[in-house]
């Protein structure tokens, strides 16, 4: 994603039906989150529409005018200190990791995979780190709404490459 951002650029985008941004296509919400209305069933696989390369009707900028580009993209080494240095210098990083069944049931605390089969992969944003009762962790923003985990965030054990999270870290310069 970072490389695409640097080479191809991305438009402003935004939440479903948000105004004042370029949305070449929309994905409606699904399921139920907190006190929001029920939006219909969520499906495991949603077909990605072909990008129209146009903004929605009524938006004042052309697609090409709305594009923003990153300056560079890079992969970080599988090294806690290198990841921490990059976050301190450039801000959050993106990490891919292997998802197991127990992750879907996370509510709070420091997540460490203990049970269940692999269900796929996922990308998240590592925004910081800390320690709780001597256990080091990454502080991570997830994309599964604020009714998941710790208000949309979670903590994952740091320093043992849990679910391979420390070997699949990417970042870029905006």
Curated annotation (Swiss-Prot):
What is an example of a GO molecular function annotated in this UniProt entry?
A: cysteine-type peptidase activity
EC category = hydrolase
Q: Which UniProt keywords apply?
A: Disulfide bond, Hydrolase, Protease, Thiol protease, Zymogen
Q: Which residues form the active site?
A: 122, 142
Q: List the disulfide bonds.
A: 22-55, 30-42
Q: What is its EC number?
A: 3.4.22.-
Q: Which InterPro entries match?
A: Papain-like_cys_pep_sf, Pept_asp_AS, Pept_his_AS, Peptidase_C1A, Peptidase_C1A_C
| Gene Ontology BP terms | proteolysis
Task of the protein: Expression of the protease correlates with blood-feeding and suggests a role for the protease in blood digestion.
Q: Which family does it belong to?
A: Belongs to the peptidase C1 family.
Spell out the protein name for this chain: Cathepsin B-like cysteine proteinase 3
Source organism of the structure: Ostertagia ostertagi
Organism lineage string: Eukaryota, Metazoa, Ecdysozoa, Nematoda, Chromadorea
């Amino acid at each position: 994603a970072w490389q695409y951002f640097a080479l191809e650029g991305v438009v402003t985008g935004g939440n479903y039906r948000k105004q004042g941004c370029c949305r070449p296509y929309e994905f409606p919400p699904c399921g139920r989150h907190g006190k929001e209305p029920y939006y219909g069933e969520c499906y495991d696989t949603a077909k990605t529409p072909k990008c129209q390369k146009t903004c929605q009707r009524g938006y004042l900028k052309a697609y090409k005018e709305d594009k923003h580009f990153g300056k560079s993209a890079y992969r970080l080494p599988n090294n806690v200190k290198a990841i921490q240095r990059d976050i301190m210098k450039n801000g959050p990083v993106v990490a891919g990791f292997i998802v197991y069944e127990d992750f879907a049931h996370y509510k709070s605390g420091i997540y460490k995979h203990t049970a269940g089969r692999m269900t796929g992969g996922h990308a998240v944003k590592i925004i910081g780190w800390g320690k709780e009762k001597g256990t080091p962790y990454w502080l991570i923003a997830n994309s599964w709404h604020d009714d998941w985990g710790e208000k949309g965030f979670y903590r994952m054990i740091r320093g043992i490459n849990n679910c391979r999270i420390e070997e699949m870290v990417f970042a870029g310069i905006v």
